[in-house]
């Protein structure tokens, strides 16, 4: 699974390696086709506010936006692969400054908030939504379970920063945590 993280926010307190590992972990736990690609972009507040107005019609910056590349894309893993085995799942855009404020309000770390938002954005790309109360309950339940599994995997790895994704395949020689299924 290819996960690309680009930090264009100017925030120097974002652990991009760990964010990449988390995204791979979530994709693996959700049984997304291992040939899918995901990009995660971290942007400044102004850029996020511009995206928020342009695509959601709402003023001001938000914490996370998701942009699916192909609404018809079946993200589930399959034994059969089309002629083009690589499919773009989509983009998750995060705003570290908004996440920082939300983390302070929630009483947890900035990194924890970014992990929550990245997981949330990925779930949107996989078709989850929270427009209705029952959808919201389901999405939050899955989101919380994924984050708890991530925490358990990180603790099992001795608290080390996971260098790899759920499969540990990043070429760094340090395995990442394995997704709980």
From Swiss-Prot:
Zn(2+) binds at residues 120, 124, 130. Binds 1 zinc ion. The keyword Zinc applies. This is Endoribonuclease YbeY. The lineage of its organism: Bacteria, Bacillati, Actinomycetota, Actinomycetes, Frankiales. Belongs to the endoribonuclease YbeY family. One of its GO terms (biological process) is rRNA processing. Keywords: Cytoplasm, Endonuclease, Hydrolase, Metal-binding, Nuclease, Ribosome biogenesis, rRNA processing, Zinc.
